[in-house]
């Protein structure tokens, strides 16, 4: 059965499902294809939750992307009418001269993120389950939280269908062929 779509997304994991949602709500005729039932337990999206945070210690350049991702998760929650991002706060512990805490501080200062730097005594007082060694500190970010990945996948795919898109699970892409301004996908 031949069908015509504006966009075909091969692989409906976390990224593919989100891409299908964004495209379908902009009015594109979208087909998402995955070789497994969507969602499934074979991808990086499998499992209950993932941590989400703004103070990205790896590099401050990621912070604008993370701010945008928080806004998009909020949009998804609003449209799907379900909770996907649960703010819990996040505590990061490490040597005061290590990579994690100084990296979080750098990102937070560069992007004016709300945070708390906790000395050893403050960590022990506020979080008694942690007794830090000399030279270790804590970094607390109230905006950090838990992202419910499988509910997010379900929300994305349900909304794709609400916007007129299709998600085909248990369908394997055998090959594809580009010709001019179109692409044929054979399953």
Regions found by a protein language model. Name each.
Residues 36-38, 121-123, 156:
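Short beta-to-alpha linker loops that shape the active-site pocket of alpha/beta-hydrolase fold enzymes
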Residues 140-187:
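Helical element adjacent to the flavin cofactor pocket in flavoenzyme catalytic cores
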Residues 49-126:
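Dinucleotide-binding Rossmann-like beta1-alpha1 core, especially the glycine-rich loop
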Residues 100, 127-135, 177-184:
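A short, glycine/Asx- and small/polar-enriched loop/turn
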Residues 26, 111, 163:
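Conserved dinucleotide-binding and phosphotransfer motif residues
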Residues 24-45:
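Glycine-rich FAD pyrophosphate-binding loop
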Residues 2-15, 31:
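Beta1/beta-strand and adjacent pyrophosphate-binding region of the FAD-binding site
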Residues 20, 24, 159:
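Gly/Ala-rich phosphate-binding loop of Rossmann-like dinucleotide-binding domains
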């Amino acid at each position: 059965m031949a069908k015509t779509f504006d966009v075909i997304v091969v692989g409906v994991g976390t990224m593919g499902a989100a891409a299908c949602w964004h495209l379908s709500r902009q009015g594109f005729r979208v087909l998402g294809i995955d070789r497994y039932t969507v969602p499934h337990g074979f991808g990086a999206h499998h499992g209950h939750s993932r941590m989400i945070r703004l103070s990205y210690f790896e590099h401050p350049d990621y912070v604008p992307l993370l701010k945008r991702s928080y806004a998009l998760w909020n949009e998804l929650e609003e449209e799907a009418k379900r909770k996907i991002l649960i703010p819990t706060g996040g505590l990061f512990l490490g040597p005061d001269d290590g990579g994690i805490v100084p990296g979080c501080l750098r990102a937070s200062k560069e992007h004016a993120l709300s945070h708390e730097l906790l000395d050893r005594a403050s960590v022990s007082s506020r979080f008694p389950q942690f007794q830090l060694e000399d030279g270790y500190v804590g970094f607390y970010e109230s905006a950090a939280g838990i992202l419910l990945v499988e509910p997010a996948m379900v929300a994305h795919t349900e909304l794709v269908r609400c916007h007129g898109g299709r998600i085909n699970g248990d369908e394997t892409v055998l090959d594809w062929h580009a010709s001019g301004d179109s692409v044929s996908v054979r399953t």
